[in-house]
Amino acid sequence: MKVYSSVRKICKSCGLIRRHGKLFVRCINSKHNQRQN
């Protein structure tokens, strides 16, 4: 999982999730997993 100041969807299977006040992008492709700091 990479940490970015701005997260975005990369492909169609990416989904935005808000958890504990942080924004996450979860995807089938593990390279697309992101977290906002």
UniProtKB/Swiss-Prot annotation:
Its main location: plastid. One of its GO terms (molecular function) is structural constituent of ribosome. Pfam families: Ribosomal_L36 (PF00444). One of its GO terms (biological process) is translation. It is found in: Plastid. InterPro entries: Ribosomal_bL36, Ribosomal_bL36_sp. GO terms for cellular component: plastid; ribonucleoprotein complex; ribosome. Keywords: Plastid, Ribonucleoprotein, Ribosomal protein. Belongs to the bacterial ribosomal protein bL36 family. PANTHER family: 50S RIBOSOMAL PROTEIN L36, CHLOROPLASTIC, LARGE RIBOSOMAL SUBUNIT PROTEIN BL36C. NCBIfam families: rpmJ_bact. HAMAP family: Ribosomal_bL36. This is Large ribosomal subunit protein bL36c. The gene is rpl36.
